[in-house]
């Protein structure tokens, strides 16, 4: 019989219970025991929920207090020496790796000051992982039995799960060599494999019939030495337990060949993103191996088209027989919200198009029953699904003729600034009169509880528009005054009116819908609530002009208008799956183009259009990069190019490895770009010299509560000046300050500005 399988389930809880419990522990409000009890309760609830929805194969070890890759590092004793601090509990050591730690000395404890580990996007998703750090000295050993413990937890509750492990080749491929080490992480495979052997043995002996082992890098362009490692790894591991080798997010292409002949129990492929994967996998599948077919998207919130999915499942069954077929999510469903329940505010016509995590589990059960018992056994469900898909395709919400007509009139000239950078920057300097090493922030300032509560009260109609506007003006005034007092050169209004840098704009454009509780994990305890693009997008009215114009009216210093750029709005939303991403990006860009011109007319001479998601939007295969970058860059330029020469366009990029796309960033033709740099050990410095416009490499990590001293800021400036012309260098944090508290924000900025003043004296 065909079985249904989920590759991973959202861990944060229906109401973000994990986030709340974790942050309460960090702030000292609750104990470690209370945090771990909440985590255990969530795991049990999620296992039972999946079982109740009819899922046959339920995952374990997909849960994490912070990040599953960091869990593996912790379990394998891959803990950099700087985090092995005396007096820290195992749990606090774990969190120090993810967040960094700064603690003053006490009578019985030494001072602690360690930065967080490097955080990287998980493939092209919006989830972030902590990059493993290895060296010749790494002593791999099974230092935590988390995977076993959680399997036994579920077993005790009467649920036999399929434990999830990140495969050894993927783990080492995404790792980096520690500072001072010249080793290629993959060279450590012989040292790491015995740890996997030990863990797989323990899981098998405990009763795990199958183990899911994730090797998603097989959807990337891989060097031969990595491909060759699969034989070494799985000739060993495949003989220890029954492994389902899992791939997702893209096409296997020729990488599928390395799977042929491996002693594994089966292979999982994502056929949502790459339908050709089924044929690729079937071609290399062994005589008794299982094929797991990922037909239900783990990345998007649209209902599965049962007619299309059933055809794929039937093809797999006809090829290998029903006993060897699993119907699965395409990837972990970590990337989508928990449940549609409670989302009563969504237009019912639109809501019927969606399926969140719980609903995806039910979809898997329906498709599996159809495969086992025939379509007649679920006729009502199949007919309802077909009706929903048809209604969406034919709905006037999805297609707006005026938007399509405007798109048809876009010309190449609309993507070009009036003059080259050198001409523009001279005019901007004459107008703005900024000092050497101008200081600024990325946009947002700390959002206090009072701000969040007031915004929520306004949304619920508990205060009037006038009361809310007065509150926002007061917050803006306070932030502007603070920036003037600490000595920043280019100010921002602080964004107190904005809940999220994407949602805020989506709420002011047509074509989006929003959830009340549609949270997904971004990193650690950070959760986001992505908008959903359901139809053609356009801007009906100005979105940010009122706040920016007010902020500029109360200061003589330049005020930045703050916008989110097209690709980031697209990538950080759940996009449509019925039109190409480039169509959606251009629609968003046209709305932003109108906003940029309105800001300029309102007297805003510096306009920042943040594009942090540009890099993560790159296709996984390099052969597809040029096409993507062409339309992505066109969208940014369409949004920003209409301004006058003396209006300065800024942009911001974060969470990215820019070496691959630095030329593309240059082609955006922004006047100033700020980039996240602090978490990458300043490794971007080597490419900064190639950039010909102004640049602001991030000087401190806003994701960590640690406050660098003035001397550290100055050292960073000195290092950057060796690569960037001093009159092109801006000084700024590496990201917005929204999630930070005021004490560390104040300390960070004061230290940064003090270092800027020292640098001006030295380099003037």
Curated annotation (Swiss-Prot):
GO molecular function: 5-methyltetrahydropteroyltriglutamate-homocysteine S-methyltransferase activity; zinc ion binding
Enzyme Commission no: 2.1.1.14
Binding site for L-homocysteine: 442-444, 495, 610
Binding site for 5-methyltetrahydropteroyltri-L-glutamate: 19, 126, 500, 523, 526-527, 572
Null mutant phenotype: Leads to methionine and adenine auxotrophy.
UniProt cofactor(s): Zn(2+)
Class of the enzyme per the UniProt entry, highest EC level: transferase
Chain positions recorded as Zn(2+) binding sites: 652, 654, 676, 735
Residues that bind L-methionine: 442-444, 495, 610
Modified residues (Phosphoserine): 182
Subcellular location field: Nucleus; Cytoplasm
Record-stated family: Belongs to the vitamin-B12 independent methionine synthase family.
HAMAP family, per database record: Meth_synth (MF_00172)
Protein name, entry field: Probable 5-methyltetrahydropteroyltriglutamate--homocysteine methyltransferase
């Amino acid at each position: 019989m065909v079985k249904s399988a989920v590759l991973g389930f959202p861990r944060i809880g229906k109401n973000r219970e994990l986030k709340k419990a974790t942050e309460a522990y960090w702030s000292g409000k609750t104990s470690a025991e209370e945090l771990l009890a909440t985590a255990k309760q969530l795991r049990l609830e999620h296992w039972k929920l999946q079982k109740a929805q009819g899922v046959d194969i339920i995952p374990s070890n997909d849960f994490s207090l912070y990040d599953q890759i960091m869990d593996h590092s912790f379990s394998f004793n891959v803990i950099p020496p700087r985090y092995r601090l005396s007096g820290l509990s195992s749990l606090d050591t774990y969190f120090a790796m993810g967040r960094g730690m700064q603690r003053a000395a006490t009578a019985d404890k030494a001072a602690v000051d360690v930065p967080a580990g490097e955080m990287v996007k998980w493939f092209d998703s919006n989830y972030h992982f902590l990059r493993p750090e290895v060296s010749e000295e790494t002593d791999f050993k099974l230092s935590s039995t988390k995977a076993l413990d959680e399997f036994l937890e579920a077993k005790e509750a009467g649920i036999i799960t399929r434990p999830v492990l990140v495969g050894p080749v993927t783990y080492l491929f995404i790792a980096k060599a520690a500072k001072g080490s010249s080793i290629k992480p993959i060279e450590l495979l012989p040292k790491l494999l015995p740890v996997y052997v030990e863990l797989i043995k323990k899981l098998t002996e405990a009763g795990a019939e199958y183990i899911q082992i994730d090797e998603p890098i097989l959807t990337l362009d891989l060097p031969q030495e990595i491909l060759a490692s699969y034989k070494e790894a799985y000739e060993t591991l495949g003989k220890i337990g029954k492994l389902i080798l899992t791939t997702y997010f893209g096409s296997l292409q020729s990488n599928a060949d390395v799977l042929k002949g491996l002693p594994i129990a089966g292979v999982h492929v994502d056929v949502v993103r790459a339908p050709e994967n089924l044929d690729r996998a079937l071609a290399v599948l062994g005589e008794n191996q299982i094929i797991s077919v990922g037909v239900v998207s783990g990345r998007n919130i649209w209902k599965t088209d049962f007619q299309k999915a059933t055809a794929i499942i039937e093809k797999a069954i006809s090829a290998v027989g029903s006993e060897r077929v699993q119907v699965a999510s395409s990837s972990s469903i970590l990337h989508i919200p928990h449940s549609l329940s409670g989302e009563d505010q969504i237009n019912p016509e639109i809501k019927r198009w969606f399926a969140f995590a719980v609903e995806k589990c039910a979809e898997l059960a329906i498709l599996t029953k159809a495969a086992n018992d025939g379509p007649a056994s679920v006729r009502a469900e199949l007919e309802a699904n077909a009706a929903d898909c048809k209604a969406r395709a034919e709905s006037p919400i999805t297609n707006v003729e005026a938007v399509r007509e405007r798109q048809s009139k876009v010309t190449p000239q609309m993507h070009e600034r009036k003059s080259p950078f050198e001409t523009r920057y001279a005019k901007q300097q004459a107008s703005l009169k900024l000092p050497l090493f101008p200081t600024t922030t990325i946009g947002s300032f700390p959002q206090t509880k009072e701000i969040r509560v007031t915004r929520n009260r306004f949304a619920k109609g508990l205060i009037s528009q006038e009361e809310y506007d007065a509150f926002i003006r007061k917050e803006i005034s306070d932030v502007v005054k603070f920036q003037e007092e600490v000595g920043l050169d280019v100010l921002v209004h602080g964004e107190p009116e904005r809940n999220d840098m994407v949602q805020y704009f989506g709420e002011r454009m047509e074509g989006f819908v929003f959830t009340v509780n549609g949270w997904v994990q971004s990193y650690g305890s950070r959760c986001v609530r992505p908008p959903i693009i359901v139809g053609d997008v356009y801007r009906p009215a100005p979105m940010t002009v009122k706040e920016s114009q007010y902020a500029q009216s109360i200061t003589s210093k330049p005020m930045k208008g703050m916008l989110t750029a097209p690709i980031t709005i697209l990538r950080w939303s759940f996009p449509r799956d019925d039109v190409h991403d480039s169509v959606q990006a251009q629609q968003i860009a046209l709305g932003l183009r109108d906003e940029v011109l309105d800001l300029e007319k309102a007297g805003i001479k510096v306009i920042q259009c943040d594009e942090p998601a540009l890099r993560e939007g790159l296709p996984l295969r390099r052969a597809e990069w040029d096409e993507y970058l062409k339309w992505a860059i066109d969208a940014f330029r369409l949004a920003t190019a209409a301004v006058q020469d003396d209006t300065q366009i800024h942009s911001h990029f974060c969470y990215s490895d820019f070496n691959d796309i630095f030329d593309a960033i240059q082609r955006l033709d922004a006047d100033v770009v700020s980039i996240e740099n602090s978490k990458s050990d300043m490794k971007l410095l080597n490419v900064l010299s190639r950039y010909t416009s102004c640049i602001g490499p991030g000087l401190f990590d806003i994701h960590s509560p640690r406050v660098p001293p003035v001397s550290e800021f100055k050292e960073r400036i000195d290092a950057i000046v060796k690569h960037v012309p001093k009159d092109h260098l801006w000084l700024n944090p590496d990201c917005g300050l929204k999630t930070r508290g005021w004490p560390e924000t104040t300390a960070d900025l004061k230290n940064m500005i003090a270092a800027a003043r020292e640098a001006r004296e030295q380099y003037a």
